[in-house]
From Swiss-Prot:
Residues the entry annotates as binding ATP: 58-65
Gene it is expressed from: MDV021
UniProt-recorded name of the protein: Replication origin-binding protein
Any one Gene Ontology cellular component term annotated for this protein: host cell nucleus
Binding partners and assembly: Homodimer. Interacts with the major DNA-binding protein. Interacts with the DNA helicase/primase complex-associated protein and the polymerase accessory protein.
Lineage: superkingdom: Viruses
UniProt keywords, alphabetically: ATP-binding, DNA replication, DNA-binding, Host nucleus, Nucleotide-binding
Organism: Gallid herpesvirus 2 (strain Chicken/Md5/ATCC VR-987)
């Protein structure tokens, strides 16, 4: 892992800025070449002194893939050399295959054409394969490929961290062997960085590597200007959508609101918002491409655009529309999410302007994926991109503190020392805390070397300023000029922080406005969907749910399970309950792994946006050790705090007790949350320092006056609140009751009042009757005014199978686990006395 000192330069260095300077200083045996006068060109592969490992870092639109095709044609001319091309996406595989066929190169096929699981034989000697399927290539083929090509290598390596990577160890070992031993390697990407160069230098030797750094980008990028807007303008959205709904059906979808001159919206020229700018261009007859990082906004903005034209195409994961990029010129408006990414490029000069709505959230796409999707449109007639970054999904809690400073301001010496000292310290701490993560993968070669970059990209999504700074650095690396709306003069620290304050306030207001519209973003679910007759649903109910679940409740749950975040929370709470039902799982990793494999793998039914019953695959996390650590700590905390979420709402969590309970296990918990939830938590000692708090407020758009003085106790509450909502969907809220417990005070029994008085240390020896005890309790109200918290749970928790038999009032084992646990050899069960109930076994 390479250490970066400056929080202002970290994002640029992780994406390959100053690459040649680093190579000259640290790897002088590598030859380098700057190309700035035109599209990228490769050295001739036929030249005897050409080095066998070629690394190309160049912006999007610099001609990398064209140069690769020319290089391949040259080296394969009158040759039987074998070629393996490893890609990161199926769409990218298909696009490269089409380009190879158009270039007239014969003998190539894709992994999609294989009828057998294992690809073997001469027909696969020139193969295009997605990295997730690399283990399906026969070892004899892998050991004999002459050329290995990794276009978009950083994205390809990033797939090692994807939930779709089911065979991580095999794939990592195969890719390591290919990079180390195959005769010729070509690696290309717009964000190749020093980590990759350093790894390949160790594997192949500096004397065998040549690096090309392209500094040219096609005019479609180099002339492009990007403006980051500070307001979404939902007042215009609501105005148009409300009128649109009231129109007769025969007049839809074309609409002109006649509140202004010439039947157009009355928008002030000074009203520069996302929707005002979009409205002007739609009314002006311009063609628009629009990227959205969320599905819901893509549907909302599609309905907005339909008010002006019926020529609208929407591409997201909930629609079955095939991605035919050649048809885009038939539409005035094309709206897409990250389903359109590397490997797909629209080259026609059809669209005038690009708009982008980006919402950084812990479960959303990282900024590199956003950047890749923005680059799919190669030419814009007006060379303008307007971006709105929704800050409402980023964390404002003290456990999430921004780590990065904007590099443009830093280059001008504009960041005060009080900011840079704090963020540099946080970057150092983050690097330190990444080192012990993913211990289960330490034996691998590639995965551990890039875990820091992966965790950095995921964890920074909790902070809007970090996300903005990363995107800013990526866009500038592609020679795109970036400006901030309202900051027309030189961007400085004060203007940047003011921008964040306005952006966060606008985002919160905008989210309230869009809540009413989001319900209609997708097709409504038919009530008559018959899920009860499905065998798959019946098996699902038997495995996870109470047998008395009602059809309407089941339908609602299956609809929610179509969302990845709900599926993750569903498995987490199921595992928490299973571990508490089987205490041996808390002491034996083998027992835990068997239970986890049972609940976190296989197919489960879902109801998609179309309202039809479907299935999705659950994939176990390879990092079972990290999961084991996390669930053990959560089980311990739940036991000590009296949290039983499947048994009903839980009340009266005392923050003092919470702090005491969390103290001993904080380090293990923080590391586990970083590994499993990709969520980096700032410890209390760091978070409570005055400079850190000031930096947090300034770079998060939070005004100091609105927040009380924090403490270790409030930090513990914040940490628990944030992480348990992410992991389990449980919400921690301030209790509004006077006394602990959910029973109304007038309904308290004598024993319950005695317990309350004893818990508060109140002497009740003189009180014998219920009336006397009640009077004493009411006189002692002031002693119960300490802050307490309730835990609110999702409605679907009522459907899950629990250890508690409510009718009998007893706890019991989950019966369906008996056959699963019977497969575990007795030697793997814990030997600690008291850990196993031998009667149950």
């Amino acid at each position: 892992m390479i250490d970066y000192a400056s929080s202002a330069s970290l994002s640029r260095m992780l994406y390959g800025e100053d690459l040649i300077d680093w190579i000259i200083k640290n790897r002088p045996g590598i030859t380098t070449e700057r190309q700035s006068d035109g599209p990228v060109t490769f050295p001739s592969p036929l030249y005897p002194r050409t080095r066998n490992v070629l690394i190309v870092r160049a912006p999007m639109g610099s001609g990398k893939t064209t140069a690769l095709m020319n290089w391949l044609q040259c080296i394969l001319c009158n040759s039987n050399m074998s070629v393996l091309i490893v890609s990161c996406r199926r769409s990218f595989t298909n696009t490269l295959s089409e380009k190879i066929n158009r270039a007239g190169m014969s003998g190539f096929c894709t992994y999609l054409s294989s009828s057998d699981y294992i690809m073997r034989g001469r027909e696969f000697s020139r193969l295009l394969v997605q990295i997730e399927s690399l283990h399906r290539v026969d070892s004899k083929l892998l050991d004999n490929y002459d050329i290995v090509i990794l276009d978009e290598i950083m994205s390809t390596i990033g797939q090692l961290f994807s939930p779709t990577m089911k065979h991580l160890c095999q794939v990592d070992n195969i890719l390591t062997s290919l990079l180390r031993y195959r005769p010729k390697i070509v690696a290309m990407d717009a964000t190749i960085n020093t980590q990759l160069i350093d790894m390949l230098a160790i594997m192949r030797g500096e004397e065998n590597i040549h690096v090309i750094v392209g500094e040219y980008a096609a005019s479609g990028f180099s002339r492009r200007s990007c403006t980051i807007l500070r307001s979404l303008g939902t007042n215009i959205l609501l105005s148009v959508m409300n009128e649109f709904k009231q129109l007769p059906s025969h007049t839809q979808p074309i609409f002109k609101q006649s509140t202004g001159v010439n039947g157009s919206l009355d928008i002030s020229l000074h009203d520069r918002t996302f929707f005002s700018e979009l409205t002007r261009r739609l009314e002006g007859g311009l063609n628009i491409c629009l990227f959205s990082s969320t599905i819901s906004f893509s549907e909302i903005v599609a309905r907005f655009c339909l008010a002006y034209t019926d020529s609208v195409l929407v591409l997201n994961s909930t629609r079955n529309t095939p991605i035919d990029i050649n048809s885009w010129s038939n539409y005035r408006v094309v709206i897409y999410t990250t389903v359109v990414t590397v490997g797909l490029s629209f080259n026609d000069s059809h669209f005038h302007s690009m708009f982008a709505y980006i919402k950084p959230t812990i479960n959303g796409p990282e900024m590199v994926s956003v950047y890749q999707s923005l680059g799919r449109i190669r030419s814009l007639r007006l060379n303008e991109v307007l971006i709105y970054i929704d800050a409402s999904g980023a964390g404002s809690e003290p456990v999430f503190t921004p780590m990065l400073l904007n590099h443009v301001i830093a280059n001008g010496g504009g960041w005060p020392t009080r900011f840079s000292q704090v963020t540099n310290m946080l970057c150092h701490n983050f690097r330190r805390d990444c080192i012990p993560t993913f211990r289960a993968a330490d034996a691998l070669y590639i995965f551990p070397r890039f875990k820091y970059k992966h965790l950095f990209e995921r964890c920074t999504l909790n902070n809007v300023s970090d996300s903005i700074n990363i995107l800013h650095a990526l866009l500038e690396s592609n020679l795109i000029h970036v400006r901030f709306d309202g900051c027309d003069l030189q961007l400085n620290a004060e203007a940047f922080c003011d921008f964040l304050v306005i952006l966060r306030a606008d985002s919160i207001t905008a989210q309230r406005d869009m809540k009413t519209l989001r319900k209609n973003a997708t097709c409504p679910l038919p009530v008559e969907v018959d899920v009860i007759d499905s065998d798959a649903v019946a098996c699902f109910v038997q495995k996870y749910l109470r047998p008395t679940v009602l059809a309407n409740d089941l339908t609602e749950l299956l609809t929610k399970l179509a969302e990845p975040i709900t599926r993750e929370q569903f498995i987490n709470i199921t595992m928490l309950e299973a571990c508490r039902a089987t205490p041996a799982a808390l002491y034996s990793e083998a027992v835990f792994c068997r239970i986890y494999d049972y609940y976190a793998s296989g197919n489960i039914p879902i109801i998609g946006p179309s309202g039809t019953l479907d299935t999705t695959i659950l994939t176990c996390d390879f990092n079972t050790s990290g999961r084991w650590d996390l669930y053990r700590v959560c089980c311990k905390w739940a036991e000590l705090l009296g949290i039983n979420p499947l048994e009903g709402p839980n009340a009266d969590i005392d923050p003092t007790k919470l702090l005491h309970v969390m103290k001993d296990d904080y380090d293990i918990y923080a590391r586990s949350v970083l590994e499993i939830a990709r969520c980096y938590l700032i410890d209390a000692q760091t978070a409570l320092k005055r400079p850190v708090r000031a930096t947090k407020c300034a770079l998060s758009g939070i005004q100091n006056s609105h927040h009380s003085q924090p403490s270790t106790q409030s930090h513990a509450v914040s940490l628990f609140k944030v992480t348990w909502e992410i992991l389990f969907g449980l919400r921690l809220t301030k209790s509004t009751t006077t006394f602990p417990g959910r029973t109304k005070v007038k309904n308290l029994r004598k024993a319950e009042i005695e317990a309350l008085l004893d818990g508060a240390g109140i002497d009740r020896t003189s009180c014998k009757t219920h009336k006397d005890l009640y009077t004493l309790l009411m006189k002692s109200k002031s002693l119960f005014r300490n802050m307490r918290y309730d835990i609110r749970r999702p409605k679907w928790y009522d459907l899950l199978r629990s250890r508690l038999d409510k009718e009998l009032g007893i706890y019991h084992d989950l019966v369906d686990l008996e056959s699963v646990l019977a497969e575990i050899p007795s030697a793997l069960w814990p030997r600690v006395e008291g850990a196993v109930d031998f009667h149950r076994l």
